[in-house]
Amino acid sequence: MREILSIHIGQAGAQVGNACWELYCLEHGIKPDGQMPSDKSVGGGDDAFNTFFSETSSGKHVPRAIFLDLEPTVIDEIRTGTYRQLFHPEQLITGKEDAANNYARGHYTVGKELVDLCLDRVRKLADQCSGLQGFLVFHSVGGGTGSGFGSLLLERLSVDYGKKSKLDFCVYPSPQVSTAVVEPYNSVLSTHGLLEHTDVAFMLDNEAIYDLCKRSLDIERPSYANLNRLVAQVISSLTTSLRFDGALNVDITEFQTNLVPYPRIHFMLASYAPVISAEKAFHEQLSVAELTNTVFDPSSMMAKCDPRHGKYMACCLMYRGDVVPKDVNAAVAVIKTKRTIQFVDWCPTGFKCGINYQPPSVVPGGDLAKVQRALCMISNTTAIAEVFSRIDHKFDLMYAKRAFVHWYVGEGMEEVEFSEAREDLAALEKDYEEVGAETAEDDGADEEM
């Protein structure tokens, strides 16, 4: 088996995790107490869904997941919620005190106490796997736990499981909506860690997903639950090929191989279609071509950044449901002829497609319509540098005055770490610029036109 462990860190990680596991359980027909009526082989299991669930001898299915937070409130909700019987109590780890939006607390003082316990649990889960394939890590980079503890844990995982893939779903601060004043500090410090210790990072940002919910689902005031359900659909689409059998299956390591041209250029943009409410879905036919156009539309991106301002290096299109390769090839051919969608000149083909016959499921009482087919696109584009430059700018404004820095230094951090992290991100912006620049021998040709 090729198992995958999910690690959910901090409030954002845990709440996205709730939405994901709720959806996985629906897709596989697993009850909130872990029973799965349709599964005939009790105890053992080489079914595809065993990549995400382990089975006990009594036929209970337990998610291969760990939830961690430095303060208990969010995870206590899981301990008392609908799915409380699904998780092993040891998989829900909480500390006593909060990281208080402070990277240094999550990374040095408070986080240090929990990290060994946490790695111990990871080891226990890893020991149950016959062929561990990698980790999915969920966290935000604006808060304290997600950014500080998140990067601490990723560092330690790199040491203990160096060869395993680490895919990271990180919620980045949005341009307008802010939940903390020190977000720019936490994000820059955390990204510095993500650069080194993750293989692929998927960028999400609340504002972009808010706008999607408002515009496409007609939700006046989207709540985090609405946002997380949408994110869960994306993550479910990425992992369907690991949990079900399909025509063109995509493995986790395939993401890396096809999307990451250089080790540092591994921050991906995700988009999903159809984001559509039940009333509308009834009147629209969502063909493969239409879905393919929609995912390239800047307004369906899950992070606030406009791909038209950059060039694509690679795209991964994951279709699910009633889709045949012929339609996909036709749709991709149309996209290639579009002038608005530009690829870097050193990557002529740039598309990887996956098809999975399992149609998308929806959470009952949720906002999304039940549809026959859906598409999730993961793209590597130079436009994602916008996200970094935005955060860097805010970081510079605050750091020039050394505002709030004493909170970090007081928790045992060195001030030099700030400038190191900032320089690393400046280098990253530069990398993105160079990757998108025209190759030297083309310059002459362009001027003649």
Swiss-Prot record:
Post-translational note: Acetylation of alpha chains at Lys-40 stabilizes microtubules and affects affinity and processivity of microtubule motors. This modification has a role in multiple cellular functions, ranging from cell motility, cell cycle progression or cell differentiation to intracellular trafficking and signaling.
Compartment list: Cytoplasm, Cytoskeleton, Spindle; Nucleus
One Gene Ontology term, aspect cellular component: spindle
Keywords: Acetylation, Cytoplasm, Cytoskeleton, GTP-binding, Hydrolase, Magnesium, Metal-binding, Microtubule, Nucleotide-binding, Nucleus
Protein name: Tubulin alpha-2B chain
Cofactor(s) needed for function: Mg(2+)
Cited InterPro entries: Alpha_tubulin (IPR002452), Beta-tubulin_BS (IPR013838), Tub_FtsZ_C (IPR008280), Tubulin (IPR000217), Tubulin/FtsZ-like_C (IPR037103), Tubulin/FtsZ_2-layer-sand-dom (IPR018316), Tubulin/FtsZ_GTPase_sf (IPR036525), Tubulin_C (IPR023123)
EC identifiers of the protein: 3.6.5.-
Its job: Tubulin is the major constituent of microtubules, a cylinder consisting of laterally associated linear protofilaments composed of alpha- and beta-tubulin heterodimers. Microtubules grow by the addition of GTP-tubulin dimers to the microtubule end, where a stabilizing cap forms. Below the cap, tubulin dimers are in GDP-bound state, owing to GTPase activity of alpha-tubulin.
Family: Belongs to the tubulin family.
GO BP, one annotated term: microtubule-based process
Organism for this UniProt entry: Physarum polycephalum (Slime mold)
Keyword Ribonucleoprotein: no
Subunit structure: Dimer of alpha and beta chains. A typical microtubule is a hollow water-filled tube with an outer diameter of 25 nm and an inner diameter of 15 nM. Alpha-beta heterodimers associate head-to-tail to form protofilaments running lengthwise along the microtubule wall with the beta-tubulin subunit facing the microtubule plus end conferring a structural polarity. Microtubules usually have 13 protofilaments but different protofilament numbers can be found in some organisms and specialized cells.
SUPFAM superfamilies to which the protein is assigned, alphabetical: Tubulin C-terminal domain-like, Tubulin nucleotide-binding domain-like
Binding of GTP, residues: 11, 71, 140, 144-145, 179, 206, 228
